[in-house]
Amino acid sequence: MTLEKELILRLNVGHNTVIRDVQLWREFEDGDGQIAVKNCLAEVVGMVNIDKLPFWLNRGQRYQCFTTSETSVNYFRAKLMRQRHRNRGIVCKVTGSQVLTKEQFEYFLFYKRLKTDINASFEIESMVLHLSTKHELDKKLIPLSADELQSVVPSNAGATMSIESILEKNKRQRILKSNSLNKQVLLNDQQQQFMSLLSQCILSGLRLRGVHRTQHEKLYKMTYKASEFAFRDELRETEPISFESIQDCVETLLKLFTKT
């Protein structure tokens, strides 16, 4: 048996971040010949507790994970190698490949494993998850009779969600969280731009009116606070506030405050 590289992943980990050169190696028979290395895209869809995974997942192919990318090393170190993450697994879905089919690779599970060497160090492994295996097992289940169903008391009611539902829920949560973060970033950017334009308009208006230094600071603060209040609704939206609107507001306030 020889350890050969079979796959190279580009992994979308969320928030427009993609880590590269995630190499998956596994053992092949010596007579298997040259192994063609395949490239594919994948995305993280959720985190799971590997101690609570169903037994049928252990039937998948197993890989050792390597990389030459410092960014990829840091990602897996932060997500899997810390003590508080000792039972964590990362579920990834294959999203694009020119050579792989859904039957070959659908999901990957990344987790850490204690190496069986003298150093007793950890390494990252990956396992292929085939939901088709679960579907086949589901078909072979013997249905219970009505009497048997009544006598069965579920020990963990509500916890029988399929792995497909869990993964889909995790994906929706990630999308909602990402959208919320993106909106907050846009709001912060708009507020910074508004503050800068507002300050420029007020200072320019005060200079044009030749306001005395003793009144300068007081008028600036009054105009600034009044303008913020006037645009309070617009500042809750991601649509930028135009320079002309800010300038008109400042001019109106300065005319009122200076009676010019």
UniProtKB/Swiss-Prot annotation:
Give the UniProt record's GO annotations in the biological process aspect: DNA replication; regulation of DNA-templated DNA replication initiation
Task: List the keywords (alphabetical).
Answer: Cell cycle, Cytoplasm, Cytoskeleton, DNA replication, Nucleus
Checking Pfam families in the record gives:
Sld7_C, Sld7_N
- Cellular component, GO annotation: cytoplasm; nucleus; spindle pole
The record's annotation in InterPro entries points to: Sld7 (IPR016808), Sld7_C (IPR041260), Sld7_N (IPR041564)
- Among its keywords, does the record have Membrane? no
Q: Where in the cell is it found?
A: Nucleus; Cytoplasm, Cytoskeleton, Spindle pole
Q: Does the keyword Nucleus apply?
A: yes
Q: Give the main location.
A: nucleus
Family (UniProt): Belongs to the SLD7 family.
Record's function text: Required for the proper initiation of DNA replication. Required for mitochondrial morphology.
Name of this chain's protein: Mitochondrial morphogenesis protein SLD7
Lineage here is: Eukaryota, Fungi, Dikarya, Ascomycota, Saccharomycotina
Which gene carries the instructions for this protein? SLD7
